[in-house]
Amino acid sequence: MENRCRKWKCLLSIWLCMVLITGCASEGKNTGSNREDRMEKEESRAVSISFLGGKDVMPITGYIGPYQLNYSADGYTFPDYITDEYFQMIADAGINLIVYSFTDYANSPELVKKNLELGEQFGIGIFVTDSNVLDKVNNESVTADEVAAELVNYSDYASFCGMYLVDEPQTTYYQTRDGSRLLPKYGKLSKVLQKDLDILCYNNLFPVINMDQNKELYERYVKEVCETIQPKVLCWDFYPFDSWREGDMSVYFWNMDLMRTTAEERNIPFWAFIQAGAQWNDDELKFDSETPYYPNESQFDWNVNTCLAFGAQGIQYFPLFQPLHFAYAESTEWDFERNGMIGVVGNKNQWYYYAQTMNKHIAAIDEVLMNSVNKGVIVSGKQAGDDTKMTSCIIESGSFQELKSVTGDALVGCFNYNGKTALYVVNYSMEYAQKIILKFDGTQSIKIVQNAEKSYVNGKNLTLDMAAGEGVLLVLE
């Protein structure tokens, strides 16, 4: 009996030791990669354009694509941009889609077809502008067959990606202006193109203007545009570095937050505009430029990266080619360098090089962002907090899944990437490099993509050395 008791005590001691050993081993495990509360996979809302490479490739668009001038004035030669040389220049910048140019199929069919041919050659998708189609907005009884009879002229080109519909449609209560683009008339044609013919249509909304007076009207405007046109992609053009805005970034973020929320409600993506220069000249006036030209590189990068952190699944640069009247000056006659990735005389401006660098980075991260769902944004630091005070998508806890805290002046976009945590970290400062520190709830295996270069680390804490305005992608493996 005594021997039996000793045997049971021995077995009990061994069992207790095994429990303690197992418990200690569990404490040392990666508490992130084996979490029971990891996210379920969600379907991304990104639009897939097969010619660009499908859903893994982010549309990087140019607004005002190649057009034909081909004449001389004041000792300058204004070239024909619809050539191999300029399409190669566009491709080298990382642009893969042209959504609008001054070339209209109704007036210049041979030039539109040349654009499409060069698009095929250089891997650049084209949205076609055709007044033969757009003029049908005034016909409420227009049929799919009538529209298809026009599209047959160019829709077989592999580079044909859709139709240009309208830029900044107007309403009777918001930005009526000349009344030439009143919203209601676009509903029928949009339905025929998008629903009946499955053609992607390009349309772009006004930004909020004079928000103090127009906030409710603008919200109504966005809702009505969506109900009327039923867009497959939501676009708007807010340029944060226009001098008259006086650096009020809270309105920039409010507008983007509204677009993000609206896109989420309608289960569509949003594409954001990035300003390639400034000092626009819609009124075709002669004036001298402010210098230095703006935005500078860190401001430009900040513009792109904050949009990506909020979940943008398309980037649009305006203008790609500088319109002739955007170069009008007073004392010097012309200024080819104050706006446009490419100036009127074919010169590469500073924003060409900024965009080229940024687009290389996007090409290294777009598979993740295009297959992710944005779950909100963490802000860290006083300036970022002040500027996003009107923003509804902020994660107030400052934590997300395995991420427990962020230190530094930063924005962190939080994403569900096929059930994994992805984070897009932005140095919020446009003036200074910073160390941004992220702390996790256990040892994590982290893929880092910075300056288009990939690296891998394991750790509970991560310190990122980030240039002003820079964005870095993290994926927790």
Q: Language-model segments: what does each one mean?
A:
Residues 22-23:
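C-terminal motif of bacterial Sec signal peptides marking the signal peptidase cleavage site
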Residues 2-12:
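Bacterial N-terminal signal peptides that target proteins for export
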Residues 26:
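Short, conserved catalytic or interaction motifs in soluble domains
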Residues 35-442, 450-477:
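Glycan-processing catalytic domains of CAZymes
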Residues 13, 31-34:
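N-terminal secretory targeting modules
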